[in-house]
């Protein structure tokens, strides 16, 4: 329930509780609010605090071991409450339906926060799409310095988006990547970085400037998905990603694209 924020000052500014709670309520899912559990006492007097914001959050893994312990304790308490409570919903008695039938009815209803990207698919060097063609330009290298995550029960980390396109700063005469794709929504996934040799890239759709992708906004090794366009109908578009004017000798990595047909 807590999104891992980028710094101590915004521990809960990017917290997703407000946006995701409606989903839990609609489908009657058990929820634990770390926000409600720990933040009220952050602003209390020192002698009344159980834990400070620094103690809960601030280390490279954010939250700290202590913070993770509190989160685990909250989830464990939730399981204890579930084990000792009556599992039958009030709705199931009132409507004469089983819990499974109630849930199935909920799933047939309108989504709580939309489903525009329910069927998004990955496009990268390995996973192609017949409705897409591309010119790599100077983005012909592969980046191996990637964000890594633990997958399933594997204790070793796995690099994310290994089938990428990287501009390595050595081809200023073709410092662009061009994608022609037929879809109704498109995400660009690019690599955030804190390295000084990382540069920015301008994103254009059908010749019109949309935004500049800047790896230094987040400033750490991270996968960043940004919406390039979203339309009601499927149509063909040409997306051009080109290094910004003074960044021709810098690096930029396109990790992949997400598209909705």
Task: Label every model-predicted segment.
Residues 1-12:
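Single conserved hydrophobic/aromatic residue that forms the stacking wall/gate
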């Amino acid at each position: 329930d807590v999104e891992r924020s980028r710094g101590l000052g915004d521990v809960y500014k990017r917290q997703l509780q407000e946006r995701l709670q409606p989903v839990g309520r609609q489908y009657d899912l058990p929820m634990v609010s770390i926000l409600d559990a720990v933040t009220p006492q952050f602003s209390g007097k020192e002698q009344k605090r159980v834990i400070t914001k620094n103690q809960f959050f601030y280390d490279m893994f954010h939250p700290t071991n202590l913070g993770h312990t509190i989160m685990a304790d909250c989830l464990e308490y939730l399981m204890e409450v579930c084990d000792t409570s009556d599992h039958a919903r009030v709705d199931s008695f009132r409507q004469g339906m089983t819990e499974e039938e109630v849930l199935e009815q909920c799933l047939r209803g309108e989504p709580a926060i939309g489903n525009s990207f329910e069927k998004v698919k990955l496009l990268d060097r390995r996973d192609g799409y017949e409705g897409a063609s591309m010119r790599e330009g100077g983005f012909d290298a592969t980046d191996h310095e990637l964000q890594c995550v633990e997958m399933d029960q594997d204790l070793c980390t796995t690099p994310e988006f290994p089938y990428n396109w990287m501009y390595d700063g050595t081809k200023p005469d073709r410092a662009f990547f061009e994608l022609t794709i037929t879809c109704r929504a498109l995400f660009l996934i690019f690599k955030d970085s804190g390295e000084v040799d990382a540069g920015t890239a301008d994103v254009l759709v059908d010749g019109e400037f949309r935004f500049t992708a800047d790896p230094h906004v987040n400033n750490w090794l991270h996968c960043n998905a940004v919406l390039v366009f979203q339309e009601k109908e499927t149509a063909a578009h040409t997306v051009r990603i080109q290094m910004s004017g003074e960044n021709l000798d810098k690096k930029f990595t396109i990790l992949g694209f997400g598209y909705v047909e």
